[in-house]
Amino acid sequence: MSRPTATLVLRNAVVATCDRSPSDAGLLPGAAVAVEGRRVAWVGRDRDLEAEVNAGGAQVIDARGGLVTPGLVDSHTHLVFAGERAGEFALRCAGRSYLQVALSGGGIAVTTRATRAAPDEQLLADAAARARRLIAQGVTTIEVKSGYGLDAPEELRLLRIVHQLGDALGGDATILPTLLFHAVPPEQVGDRAAFVREACAALIPQVARERLAVFCDVFVEDGAFAPDEARRLLQAAKDRGLVPRVHAEQLTAGGGARLAAELGCASADHLEELDDAGVAALAEARVVAGLLPLSTLFLGSERYAPARRLLEAGVPVSLATNMNPGSAMSENVGLTLSLACLKLGLTPAEALVAFTAGGARALRQPDLGRIARGADADLVLWGCGSPEHLAWHMAVNHALVVVKHGRVVHEAPSAAMVDCR
């Protein structure tokens, strides 16, 4: 086999391949990664680099003992919205629950009004700023949902803005759009059946026809959609080639996880109220469990998703920020990793794999979330030498260099400094 000709090399690194198992980050000390174009061409011992790779013309980054991982895959976000809900946050700090606030006119309805009133340019600029904050922390793939328009014209508008987001970022991250059914529009609450029927007959086919979304997601919850309504929406989406996903068991045990298993969804996300039957259903169907600990923290709850039970049952798991204005107003990757360890019971290695390979699996993107020959060259050099350090020094951005498709897209001002103690 001829030697690959590298265009980019990261050497003197601790490489985490994240391609072994959910509990094994695949650490390779004293390693290097060679990139050819947009793909990983070689991974191995640093001392073997010159013999096995033609790196004479490559850009070389000396990791100085730092950790190199796959680019993070944020598999659950709501980046496109307008307005704020700081007043609602204060109400919850005073003891009101999320559902109580929503039933009194707050919640998604507040964001829907602001989003509908905002011009496209504002929505795009705000979403791009949020995405840039994620990229600067090592995220190279972002799933982005619609969901705050609620009615068909507004949902189509939001999905078109999500498509523009990829161009606005200049290819610095992969953007994967999702049509989200968040709630019945206020104009149609008197005839829910008509809304579901019209969505299945018109909105979903148009989204599929115009290729505006890869996924279709439904919020299965009291006050949102019942399992039977979600089943109709998701089956219509599947029939049109969209990949189904669900928000499940976040605030109540609503049967969303079992529905996800029944329909073969790519993922069931949240799961704070998941019971043993739901765990078993996800395990049997091999549906990815999407863990979103920032939401649990933000809502002031101590009832986190049963991550250990899920892993022990063989359920694949992903980890994501769930950045949104109502239940997780944060793009903090470091805090997400730390919460996964402190509150979900994951090891640092498990948290890292969940945020890389797990996210890729939730989005059905096999070339993402791992470092292996032929995989996408999405890489991060961190200012520390281990997954443990990433989770231990919490809520800090440790990303020094972020690479997307073999191109450096972000470099921290302190990129010369690596703390590998």
From Swiss-Prot:
Return the Pfam families for the record.
Amidohydro_1
Q: Annotated pathway, please?
A: Amino-acid degradation; L-histidine degradation into L-glutamate; N-formimidoyl-L-glutamate from L-histidine: step 3/3
Binding sites annotated in the UniProt record for N-formimidoyl-L-glutamate? 148, 324, 326
Gene3D superfamilies with a match to the protein in the record: Metal-dependent hydrolases, Urease, subunit C, domain 1
Q: Where in the cell is it found?
A: Cytoplasm
Source organism superkingdom: Bacteria
**Residues given in the record as Zn(2+) binding sites:** 76, 78, 247
**Entry keywords, A to Z:** Cytoplasm, Histidine metabolism, Hydrolase, Iron, Metal-binding, Zinc
Listed GO biological process terms: L-histidine catabolic process to glutamate and formamide; L-histidine catabolic process to glutamate and formate
How far does the signal peptide extend, from start to end residue?
Answer: none
Q: What is its EC number?
A: 3.5.2.7
Q: Give the reaction(s) catalysed.
A: 4-imidazolone-5-propanoate + H2O = N-formimidoyl-L-glutamate
Q: Which residues bind 4-imidazolone-5-propanoate?
A: 85, 148, 182, 250, 327
Residues annotated as binding Fe(3+): 76, 78, 247
Q: What are its cofactors?
A: Zn(2+); Fe(3+)
Annotated Gene Ontology cellular components are: cytoplasm
Gene Ontology terms for molecular function: imidazolonepropionase activity; iron ion binding; zinc ion binding
What remark does the entry make about the cofactor?
Binds 1 zinc or iron ion per subunit.
- Write down the NCBIfam families for this protein, in alphabetical order: hutI
Q: Which family does it belong to?
A: Belongs to the metallo-dependent hydrolases superfamily. HutI family.
Functional description taken from the UniProt entry: Catalyzes the hydrolytic cleavage of the carbon-nitrogen bond in imidazolone-5-propanoate to yield N-formimidoyl-L-glutamate. It is the third step in the universal histidine degradation pathway.
Write down the PANTHER family for this protein, in alphabetical order.
IMIDAZOLONEPROPIONASE, IMIDAZOLONEPROPIONASE-RELATED
Official protein name in the record: Imidazolonepropionase
Can you name the source organism?
Answer: Anaeromyxobacter dehalogenans (strain 2CP-1 / ATCC BAA-258)
**Upper classification of the organism:** Bacteria, Pseudomonadati, Myxococcota, Myxococcia, Myxococcales
